[in-house]
Amino acid sequence: MNTFSQVWVFSDTPSRLPELMNGAQALANQINTFVLNDADGAQAIQLGANHVWKLNGKPNDRMIEDYAGVIADTIRQHGADGLVLLPNTRRGKLLAAKLGYRLNAAVSNDASTVSVQDGKATVKHMVYGGLAIGEERIATPYAVLTISSGTFDVAQPDASRTGETHTVEWQAPAVAITRTATQARQSNSVDLDKARLVVSVGRGIGSKENIALAEQLCKAIGAELACSRPVAENEKWMEHERYVGISNLMLKPELYLAVGISGQIQHMVGANASQTIFAINKDKNAPIFQYADYGIVGDAVKILPALTAALAR
């Protein structure tokens, strides 16, 4: 048996749902999707869900992962085994841990490949900071996986599809985290997972002000702007949501233009699936050139304006 009888899908990030649903279609005979509202439920059915389970009644001061109890109860009530697919977001991983405990299931995070043989999941994911690929065969009846972005293709909606909708009512957990306040994040983030062209800057750009040069290039060629982890986490020059690497974004654009990025393995794990990699770095020995299809050795601050002018013609 090369599929599970049932798969259970939930995504706290709506943009990740089409990819998870495509994976579900390949891995199971029946697809169950947990959603937070009617609109997401309608989308899930168009993407292939046979059954939609609307999570209902969570107080505003409680976290999404507090649904773990009723989600696990629902899963157990409908089969003695099954596969659970979640996105590898922060909330997704927190929910995965809670479900793993309640289902007595093995949990595997950041899966980049998933297959099924004899009713058991085999999962591959990065280990040792991206230096190697680890493979795990999950032996527990239930398997809970968080899926890296780009693992599956995106499912296409079909308005002719039909499915059944059910309601799952909130049950307060015995121990819960209560949200006491929220603060809006200042962010101009975009969905980089869908970008065809990406210009990504590293600390070699020199300063926060010089990022404007990369932004001008993005406007000229219709690209989206990303960065390396040090730019976001250490220098605080850009938003956390834009950094590429093993612990955040895993991209597969047609073009990845790396500007002032050294090319350490932790970063390249998030970019080396790009169709074409173009590197600009003043260090001719930078590791990025080992991955690049094309490269320019030189000062990015001088090269970017010239490149922008040439491509804008």
UniProtKB/Swiss-Prot annotation:
Recite the UniProt keywords alphabetically.
Electron transport, FAD, Flavoprotein, Transport
Q: Which Gene3D superfamilies match?
A: HUPs (3.40.50.620), TPP-binding domain (3.40.50.1220)
Q: In which pathway does it act?
A: Amine and polyamine metabolism; carnitine metabolism
Q: What is this protein called?
A: Protein FixB
Q: Organism's domain of life? A: Bacteria
Record GO biological process: carnitine metabolic process; fatty acid beta-oxidation using acyl-CoA dehydrogenase
Q: What does this protein do?
A: Required for anaerobic carnitine reduction. May bring reductant to CaiA.
Instruction: Quote the SMART domains the UniProt record gives.
Output: ETF
What assembly does the database describe for this protein? Heterodimer of FixA and FixB.
In terms of Pfam families, this protein maps to:
ETF, ETF_alpha
Tell me its family: Belongs to the ETF alpha-subunit/FixB family.
Electron transport as a keyword? yes
Report residues binding FAD. Answer: 255-283
Q: Name one GO molecular function term.
A: flavin adenine dinucleotide binding
